[in-house]
Amino acid sequence: MRTVWQHCHVATMAEGRYSAIEDAAIVTSAGLIEWIGPRAELAPVDADRTVDLGGAWITPGLIDCHTHAVFGGNRSGEFEQRLQGVSYAEIAAQGGGIASTVRATRAASEDELFASARQRVQALMRDGVTTLEIKSGYGLDLANERKMLRVARRLADELPLAVRATCLAAHALPPEYAGRADDYIAHICDEMLPALAAEGLVDAVDAFCEHLAFSPAQVERLFIKARELGLPVKLHAEQLSSLHGSSLAARYQALSADHLEFMTEEDAIAMAAAGTVAVLLPGAFYFLRETQLPPMDALRRHGVKIALASDLNPGTSPGLSLRLMLNMGCTCFRMTPEEALAGVTVHAATALGLGDSHGSLEVGKVADFVAWQIERPADLAYWLGGDLPKRVVRKGHEISN
């Protein structure tokens, strides 16, 4: 079906800029953008439908490129404990922290995980998200990692959005491998990844590179295996310390390196050369009350593409609003509103390997876009909450009005 969408203003986000078109029109057909430009330049179109957008601003559909949306349990009690002065180490000693989420996720059925994740994902969708990434990493064995990744695939099948599934089996050390990190990495490489990839459940491979998780050498073994399987890689890096994980990610042409509060200029240079996207996660920075800022000047100076994401997870960023992350990116990390919007559209698409098809409003790309009743694009980063999108369009069809 061919549809003409008109009486609107468009922030195309081409090349990471607003690239605004005033009094614009968009023609969509077969789920793609067939034409976009000033309405006055639109030639007569044999359209099945014409939609008046009432002067709304149009942006690409928002893309949340880093989430842990599938998990069992609830850790709000730990939040209360931390506010009362209980340390993370004490909480962990009591059986809390990520270990509690692993236990709850292992105990939950696939249907239970799907039902809870569906609610969280629908909250993101109401905020204008049309594409998101979902990581595993709370199962930490083959059966439970498979269960989480199956939920991610089901969400894509049953909801009108695109989902990229990332295997994060190297998220933490499971209790049955206590003190045997090398053995666990070998198990992931020899057993888990080949099986999950063969089942078509994995779009990318991720790991957590930190002193409290996995070393660069262990991560490199995982990356080598991912490359053998034809899977792109990503990395949680430099969140708590500098291990130059982001440089390691760049050596393997990673789609992205994420967090990056402690990255160095050397890391930024390596990422720029490799085309690896820097995914910043202000929700975790805010929730954990961190003080070390990502090196924004170095990222800009070397031309590293910068994305923003919610990092939705039960322990460090229980954030259900990607629009709130726009504001946090500006207030916490000193991004401009234009940089922040690029971070949840065109650069987020690149961080998922979707840069050729998603993330900006250009001819030939997927017709995912959002209509906002705002005065200017910067309003999306300026307002804390407020009205939901006026319309959300996925592959040229309205999914919310």
UniProtKB/Swiss-Prot annotation:
Mitochondrion is among the record's keywords: no
UniProt main location, coarse: cytoplasm
Catalytic activity line of the entry: 4-imidazolone-5-propanoate + H2O = N-formimidoyl-L-glutamate
Biological pathway: Amino-acid degradation; L-histidine degradation into L-glutamate; N-formimidoyl-L-glutamate from L-histidine: step 3/3
GO cellular component terms listed in the entry, alphabetical order: cytoplasm
Residues annotated for N-formimidoyl-L-glutamate binding in this entry: 138, 313, 315
Any one GO biological process: L-histidine catabolic process to glutamate and formamide
EC number: 3.5.2.7
The UniProt record lists the keyword Cytoplasm: yes
Binding site residues for 4-imidazolone-5-propanoate: 75, 138, 171, 239, 316
Enzyme class: hydrolase
GO molecular function, one term: imidazolonepropionase activity
Cellular location(s): Cytoplasm
Function per UniProt: Catalyzes the hydrolytic cleavage of the carbon-nitrogen bond in imidazolone-5-propanoate to yield N-formimidoyl-L-glutamate. It is the third step in the universal histidine degradation pathway.
Protein name: Imidazolonepropionase
Species the sequence originates in: Pseudomonas putida (Arthrobacter siderocapsulatus)
